[in-house]
Amino acid sequence: VYTYDGGSAIFDGFGEIIDCCAPFTPELKFVDLDSGCRGRNAIPIPVAQGSDIGSAYSALNYGIRKFLAMIGMKRVVIGVSGGIDSAVSAALYGTVLDPGDLLLVSMPSMYTSRTTRDLAGKLARNLGCLYSVMPIQDAVEFTVGQISKTPVINMKTGKRQQLAVAPFVAENIQARD
């Protein structure tokens, strides 16, 4: 995510900030510079020192709002696994959207633990948003079947063989299917 924080500043001839705009806020500011003082008599303003986390949050919140507005999207669907990545994404979008415009979808299979299923539901309850559970085991089995039934042909010899799908590969299919 790329965001431009705003926070434009005006410096005097000695490098002191004499005025600045607020970060992550569209702002047009007119500043009257007294040419007689050449900036040195101006009173430097304190620059807000935010935390790295607070600044990162502001940047992400601003970026999400601007991106959604730019593409005209008012509602979002997020697949939630019960893990940290989807939880952070859902929490960020939860600060930008009304709860009725955010749908979290849990897509369990045989590889999904009870703990992660429960965490996905708890996340949706905590955010007060829409929630759905759509099991994907049938889709995973279909994809595994497609892979294992598709012949692989050695173009030199004409020999045909089948691909075997190992259990850890099937688990990765589940994550991407």
List each model region and its residues.
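Generic secondary-structure signature for well-ordered alpha-helical cores
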Residues: G13-E16, C20-P23, G36, N61-A69, ...
